[in-house]
Every structure is written in C-alpha cells, then in structure tokens.
Amino acid sequence: MSQKILFATGNKGKARELKEAFKTAGVDVEIITNSDLDNPPHPIESGRTFEANAKIKAHELADYSKLPTIADDSGLMVDALNGEPGVRSARYAGEAHNDAKNNAKLLANLGGIPDEKRTAKFWTTIVVSMPGEFEKDLVVSGTCSGRILAAPRGDDGFGYDPLFFVPKKDKTFAQMTTDEKNEISHRGNVVRELLKVLPALA
C-alpha cells in the first residue's frame, strides 16, 4: 500500500506538478491535498521568508491531519525590483489578487526596463513535517532562472508562468508541458533534492 502524504495546499496547479514529479521519480506515494480533508485550517502565512511560511503551513496541517505533511512556499524574485514580489508573490496585487492582477502589476512595475535587465528566478522551499516531531523537519530549496517578458505567452501553467521565459528552452513555463516544466523548474528541482534526503519515500 502506498504511503499517504498530505501536500498542504489548495493550489491545484502546484498539486498536479508535485504528483507528476513524484511519479516521474518512481516514488510510490498517495498524495492528498487540503481539499481532501474535512474543514481544514487555513494557515496565515505571516513569515518573512519562504522557509518560515512553509513551516507555518506544514506544522498546522500536520497537527490537524496527523499525516506526514509536505508544504511549500514559492515566489518570483525579480532582480530589477530588488527581489520583489518575493514572499508576497501570490498576493502581489493586494487583497483582491488573482493571477491576472498579479501579472498586470508585475508588468507595470517593469515598464521601461529593457529585456536584458528583466532577469528573475523562481524559488521554492519545501518543508516535510511529521506530526509531533517538528524538530525533525526536513527543509530543501530549489530555483530556476529566467527573465520576465513584456507580454504573456502560452496557455498552460498558473501564476506568473506566462511571463517567465527560460532561455535554454526558448519557452515560457506556460508554453511547456508538465514534464518539460518539471525537468527544469524550481519545483521539479526541489523535489529531486527532497528525494535525496527522504529515503523513506524513494
């Protein structure tokens, strides 16, 4: 029987990518998400770093579910904007945010900045927590470098994917298949790092 693990997210795009990454790596686990739980908590991401926010989510959901729990916090860091939007990536446009509004704000803030200075990277930190054993948390991080286009390209993906161009693939994340994206993405990279330090799942 596959080991059951909770991925502490309500983001279907993130969940799909993680499941595909584990499948590609040949890891036999059953990954469930917040939507599979009865009235799950909604942690407040009040941390100032990706690791802090991931731990907040992992600890609260592990306590609630009594399952081994994976949580991630990810963000886009744009060099010309001094690392913004960073930990505020999902809420960049304010309380009434959505992907379109976040992307529009990013493009507005990069107005007039030439292509060669629109460099950026995606960053993901994953925390794995066991209920009642938070002192044993596993923490791994992964990145992917690229640049921000002046207009979106592609119909797949989520978040900033249509604007994040990866030169070595000559595509945005939104133009890639899930397998292509997992091969090079921050989340794909962090899952590979996770498997190196998590032999129980490998």
Curated annotation (Swiss-Prot):
Homodimer. Its cofactor is Mg(2+). The keyword rRNA-binding does not apply. GO terms for molecular function: dITP diphosphatase activity; ITP diphosphatase activity; metal ion binding; nucleotide binding; ribonucleoside triphosphate phosphatase activity; XTP diphosphatase activity. Binds 1 Mg(2+) ion per subunit. It comes from Lactobacillus acidophilus (strain ATCC 700396 / NCK56 / N2 / NCFM). It is an enzyme of class 3 (hydrolase). This is dITP/XTP pyrophosphatase. Belongs to the HAM1 NTPase family. The active site is at D73 (proton acceptor).
